[in-house]
Amino acid sequence: MNISVSEVKLIDIVQKMMSNYYLKLGKWSCSRIAWKASNYVTGGLYRVAGTAWSNEEAVHWSLILKVVVPAIQADDPQHYNYWKREVLAYQSGILEQLPEMIRAPRCLAVEEQDDHTIWLWLEEVTDRIGAEWTGQQYEEVVRLLGRFNGAYLCGVPLPDEAWLCKGWLASWVEECDKYDDRSVLNEEAWEIPILKGLFPTNIVRRYKEFYRTRGLLLKGLQRLPRVLTHNDAWPPNLFPQGKDSLIAIDWAFVGIAGLGEELGRLYGLLLHSSVDTAAAVATRNDFLNRLLDSYIAGIREAGWDGDSDWVRFGFTASAGMRCGMVIPKLIEQINKKKDEELLTDEMKARCNIAVHLLELAEEASLLLPKILGGRRS
């Protein structure tokens, strides 16, 4: 997408950002960030940067311009990917009222364009970690996410705007179902020999049971204590500012969800993003449990003292639900290859990840009677 930035508008934005309305604009440039959009409501990300002059002194500045694209298929405010949600989140002021340990980038301007796209002019943020996080850094970040979510159970008012998604995961599952022909529920789909070494012998029965009970898992998630969630909180969108504060970008999925879902979403995305990382994570229950313990510790720091099983259910159910997308795709891809020699190590690793996700869903099912039959803590 080609864009044309108005210098007159840019001057106003830079002056506002610098809190200096006498600044004069110097040289500047606008360059598209080398990033492939994974969301069809994002038309592009641009870095706009340059110098400004104040009393003959040069001041360097930079901004991020995010182009939001209208999408008919995501025009329902309760659709998980409602195209205008992030714009409304900034305009409403909700993102300026977050608990102290987390903040969104400052929004300098919202511009509606003649082509019906909307431009978000945002503060450029950086972190203090770098590209690769250590296990300890993951724990520190999820502790902050626990404090963020837990704050809404301990005095911070829960927003109720109509455009906040109240059933993000259920909407996502419904969208995924549009691309699933259900063939994986038939025994025939699993009969090719190469599948026998990739999955446990009882995988068909177990997956069918998951598919049968997933509606109950979603119902259980609705029973959990309700909190404000980012819903896309994982390393590319999180910028730690030390041990006690965090900047989160990309609030397009912000909504109301159950306690624990934030962590389940992070964990599921982590497994999906990098096979090397995922393969290591999926075979290390200590990492999973350390993340969960850190998240619960953050909730406790916020002041919530409820039953941790509710949190564990939120985590395992929301992460495990991802197997309903992953397994059908894998079986389809493997059936196309037929020959075991054509299967890559990556594909084999993804099969292990899929089984791990299914195991999480099964753990959630064991907790389900307590969740559906108990009182919210």
Predicted regions and their residues:
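Conserved NTP-binding catalytic cores of kinases and kinase-like/nucleotidyltransferase enzymes
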Residues: 1-115, 241-246, 260, 368-377
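C-terminal amphipathic "assembly/sorting" segment characterized by alternating charged
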Residues: 29, 319-377
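Residues on conserved beta-strands of the protein kinase catalytic domain
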Residues: 61, 118, 226-227
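Active-site activation/catalytic loop segments of kinase-like enzymes and analogous catalytic loops
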Residues: 88, 260-303, 320-339
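Short, glycine/acidic-rich hinge or "gate" loops at secondary-structure transitions
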Residues: 106, 112, 156-169, 305-312
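Conserved short submotifs of the Hanks-type protein kinase catalytic core
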Residues: 117-127
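ATP-dependent phospho-/nucleotidyl transfer catalytic cores
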Residues: 125-147, 154-230, 339-347, 356-359, ...
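Catalytic activation segment of kinase domains across protein kinase-like and atypical kinase folds
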Residues: 235-272
